């Protein structure tokens, strides 16, 4: 079996070139190695390490950091907090629910519309629609046998009975679960643990699959975002943004910060910015129905001089100049069509186009963003989500949302068959939790260099955790002591890991929780095993 480096080095070469590195010299050697059938995997590993160590060329015209502090420092001036009101009218609980329910419904409708033609270019979509006598498109896509895979029949016109399973919806649910678990104290590690606990590996793709693979090798955020991951600027983080905007109405900065935490487990640079941009737009859509203001809120949370910001500004300008979305699509294609079909930048431009034309016409918004091609289900879902907030569930066209029958299927463990209204209600319940911000850190710091001994009560029975010796012991079963393989304390958050020898293979356990004075609370992963502890010795 070929090494992973051999399989992905061409994608990494393109990524490094796009992020501003001078790859001319190493590209020659990489292509020669690819052409050499006898080239050893060790050579590809060496080339890959050299390639990913290249610095950004000083002539690169953009500033694109990947830490939250650096991103914040490079943002343009913008309004980051709004009163929870639209047009001067406070958003009461009923209105908030209508907006959030509209967001979930709109996201599902846009996703279902784009799902059957995911990855198709605009020309192929239009050719299909002409053959189906479905232009102009004013409903879901008809099914044409032998041209549309049978797997997409549940998302085709006259065949929709629910929102079929799609990763664009799976990740919205995963984000909801992570927020229900940790609230505003959500961390990259807690999200990673949620993926492992709830999401099958085979149901994630590109950057998410690379990150998930890294988790299984104990490569955790933020390193998981870059290690052997040439897809780190693809759209995968952007499609995970929505839930973080839903829970932060009127708070684009808070939404973007939550989105950063999520994005940082699998993405870098513009991959991160895409999720922050969308989350901030969603937060603003609760407050204003003006496309320019929604888009400005998104731009306000990402570096002013990054490639994504340039593409957004270009697209907004073209939309303001043109009444025909297809003319704007042509300009987007000419300027940004060189990016991969599922890259963040080109697809974000289509989202901006869909939001601009859709703020007064839900159907036009999702139809234009899907007919434009590229990552159609992702873009339709994001545009539908934003417009669902703008219009609210009650005002969404029945032909687009009624056929879903308030039902959403997912691959998320324990959440496979959902009532969309229930998901919306669970989301609303988090809004005030998120508005309060992270919990106050405990008054007493743990003396970490002498972390002491702790008696734990867990779903696996009593254990003794000793930071002095760096071990954990299962008291009733005579298992251990096992050495801690990693530990980290950032008041009040505590993480530690250990491995259980299973007769020749190691079963890795990860603890995630917090300490308040002499009390420890958290969970063991995998399995979400409750852990309660009390310090017994200093």
What would you call each of these model-derived segments?
Residues 109-115, 120-136, 267-270, 277-279, ...:
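Catalytic phosphate/nucleotide-handling subdomain of diverse soluble enzymes
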Residues 153-168, 179, 420-449:
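C-terminal domain-closing interface element
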Residues 1-45, 49-59:
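Long, charge-dense tracts
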Residues 183-235:
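Extracytoplasmic mature domains of secreted/periplasmic and thylakoid-lumen proteins
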Residues 76-93, 212-235, 241-255, 259-373:
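Accessory "access/gating" subregions that flank catalytic or transport cores
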Residues 73-109, 113-170:
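An N-terminal structural lobe/cap that precedes and organizes the functional/catalytic core
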Residues 448-515, 524-537:
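Central antiparallel beta-sheet cores of small beta-barrel/beta-sandwich binding domains
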Residues 155-191, 195-204:
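Aromatic-rich carbohydrate-recognition surfaces in CAZymes
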């Amino acid at each position: 079996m070929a090494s992973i480096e051999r399989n992905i080095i061409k994608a990494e070469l393109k990524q490094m070139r796009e992020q501003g590195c001078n790859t001319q010299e190493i590209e020659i050697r990489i292509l020669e190695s690819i052409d050499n059938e006898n080239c050893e995997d060790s050579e590809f590993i060496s080339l890959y390490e050299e390639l990913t160590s290249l610095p950004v060329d000083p002539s690169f015209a953009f500033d694109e950091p990947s830490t939250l502090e650096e991103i914040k420092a490079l943002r343009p001036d913008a309004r980051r907090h709004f009163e929870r009101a639209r047009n001067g009218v406070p958003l009461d609980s009923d209105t908030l629910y209508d907006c959030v329910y509209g967001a979930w419904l709109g996201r599902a409708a846009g996703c279902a519309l784009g799902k059957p033609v995911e990855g198709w270019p605009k020309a192929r979509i239009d050719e299909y629609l002409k053959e189906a006598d479905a232009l102009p498109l004013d409903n879901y896509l008809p099914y044409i046998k032998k041209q549309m895979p049978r797997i997409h029949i549940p998302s085709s016109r006259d065949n929709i009975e629910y929102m079929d399973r799609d990763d664009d919806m799976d990740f919205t649910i995963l984000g909801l679960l992570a927020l229900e678990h940790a609230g505003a104290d959500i961390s990259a590690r807690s999200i990673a643990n949620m993926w492992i606990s709830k999401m099958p590996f085979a149901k994630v793709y590109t950057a998410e699959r690379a990150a998930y693979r890294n988790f299984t090798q104990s490569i955790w955020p933020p390193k998981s975002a870059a290690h052997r991951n040439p897809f780190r600027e693809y759209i995968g983080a952007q499609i995970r943004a929505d839930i973080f905007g839903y829970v932060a109405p009127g708070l684009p900065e808070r939404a973007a910060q939550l989105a950063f935490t999520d994005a940082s487990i699998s993405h870098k640079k513009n991959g991160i910015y895409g999720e922050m941009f969308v989350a901030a737009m969603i937060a603003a859509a609760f407050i204003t129905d003006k496309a320019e203001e929604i888009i400005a809120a998104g731009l306000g949370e990402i570096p002013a001089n990054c490639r994504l910001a340039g593409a957004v500004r270009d697209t907004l300008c073209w939309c303001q100049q043109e009444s025909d979305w297809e003319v704007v699509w042509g300009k987007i294609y000419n300027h940004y069509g060189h990016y991969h079909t599922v890259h963040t930048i080109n697809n974000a431009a289509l989202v901006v186009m869909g939001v601009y034309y859709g703020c007064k016409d839900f159907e036009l918004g999702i139809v234009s963003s899907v007919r434009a091609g590229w990552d159609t289900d992702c873009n339709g879902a994001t545009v539908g989500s934003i417009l669902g907030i703008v219009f609210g569930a009650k005002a969404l066209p029945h032909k687009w949302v009624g056929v879903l029958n308030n039902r959403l299927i997912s691959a998320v463990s324990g959440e496979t068959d959902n009532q969309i209204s229930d998901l919306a209600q669970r989301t609303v319940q988090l809004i005030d939790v998120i508005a309060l911000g992270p919990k106050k850190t405990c008054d007493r710091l743990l003396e970490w260099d002498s972390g002491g001994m702790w008696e734990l009560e867990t779903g696996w029975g009593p254990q003794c955790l000793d930071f002095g010796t760096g071990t954990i012991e299962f008291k009733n079963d005579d298992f251990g002591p096992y050495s801690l393989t990693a530990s980290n304390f950032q008041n009040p958050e505590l993480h530690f890991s250990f491995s259980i020898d299973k007769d020749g293979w190691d079963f890795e356990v990860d603890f995630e929780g917090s300490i308040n004075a002499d009390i420890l609370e958290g969970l063991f992963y995998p399995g979400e095993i409750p852990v309660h502890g009390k310090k017994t010795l200093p």
